[in-house]
Amino acid sequence: MTVGKSSKMLQHIDCRMRCILQDGRIFIGTFKAFDKHMNLILCDCDEFRKIKPKNSKQAEREEKRVLGLVLLRGENLVSMTVEGPPPKDTGIARVPLAGAAGGPGIGRAAGRGVPAGVPMPQAPAGLAGPIRGVGGPSQQVMTPQGRGTVAAAAAAATASIAGAPTQYPSGRGGPPPPMGRGAPPPGMMAPPPGMRPPMGPPMGMPPGRGAPMGMPPPGMRPPPPGMRGPPPPGMRPPRP
């Protein structure tokens, strides 16, 4: 409902009003709002009702109840009267203004993190783990190293040249066996003790293809000068 500025109801806003209902109850509260149906909103409202005695000899007594915020229906309203003027603090801002004088307190920003000088709580022994970025193994130890890396080979070569024993990591096998003069090639059995191992192929010739033509097999003496050697493998000897 559109209410004009000259309405009498607007003149009583924030006043203490006494509202009498049809059943005889009286509501006294601060008048805050209304509508076209005369529904009222009262705050800090108190209810007063008269209680009739059981005997005619006793006087009628009045009972008070504190209600607070009340929405009062207009159909039950009989009359409204002004009980008192508006409170003195009506219209005063609850929030302090920018130019208002400050109080004795000191405004400080909310702290972030742990304040200085406060000891850090320590975890029980056995439950404290490594803090990220503090302590723990170095980056070189945590770097994964594969078999036959260039760094491992260079370190082993440097240690062997210096005469220090080379240490190999556990679980990756021991050092490779030394390749001596009489060591058998891979895949062949070693000769019995006391027997000279067979001679390997000459330099520059791939193993496993036999000896060149005109040369005896390993372990045999060459023929005397002027005499033909044995025929090559796969050929029949000449007839006499």
Swiss-Prot record:
PROSITE patterns: SM (PS52002). Methylated by PRMT5. Arg-108 and Arg-112 are dimethylated, probably to asymmetric dimethylarginine. The modification Dimethylated arginine is found at residues 108, 112. Pfam families: LSM. GO terms for molecular function: RNA binding; snRNP binding. GO terms for biological process: mRNA splicing, via spliceosome; spliceosomal snRNP assembly. The keyword Nucleus applies. The modification Omega-N-methylarginine is found at residues 108, 112, 147, 172. Sequence repeats lie at residues 175-181, 191-196, 216-221, 222-228, 230-236. Residues 4-86 form the Sm domain. Residues 174-205, 214-240 have a biased composition (Pro residues). The modification Asymmetric dimethylarginine is found at residues 108, 112. Plays a role in pre-mRNA splicing as a core component of the spliceosomal U1, U2, U4 and U5 small nuclear ribonucleoproteins (snRNPs), the building blocks of the spliceosome. Component of both the pre-catalytic spliceosome B complex and activated spliceosome C complexes. As a component of the minor spliceosome, involved in the splicing of U12-type introns in pre-mRNAs. As part of the U7 snRNP it is involved in histone pre-mRNA 3'-end processing. Belongs to the snRNP SmB/SmN family. PANTHER family: SNRPN UPSTREAM READING FRAME PROTEIN, SNURF, SNRPN UPSTREAM READING FRAME PROTEIN-RELATED. Core component of the spliceosomal U1, U2, U4 and U5 small nuclear ribonucleoproteins (snRNPs), the building blocks of the spliceosome. Most spliceosomal snRNPs contain a common set of Sm proteins, SNRPB, SNRPD1, SNRPD2, SNRPD3, SNRPE, SNRPF and SNRPG that assemble in a heptameric protein ring on the Sm site of the small nuclear RNA to form the core snRNP. Component of the U1 snRNP. The U1 snRNP is composed of the U1 snRNA and the 7 core Sm proteins SNRPB, SNRPD1, SNRPD2, SNRPD3, SNRPE, SNRPF and SNRPG, and at least three U1 snRNP-specific proteins SNRNP70/U1-70K, SNRPA/U1-A and SNRPC/U1-C. This is Small nuclear ribonucleoprotein-associated protein B'. It comes from Monodelphis domestica (Gray short-tailed opossum).
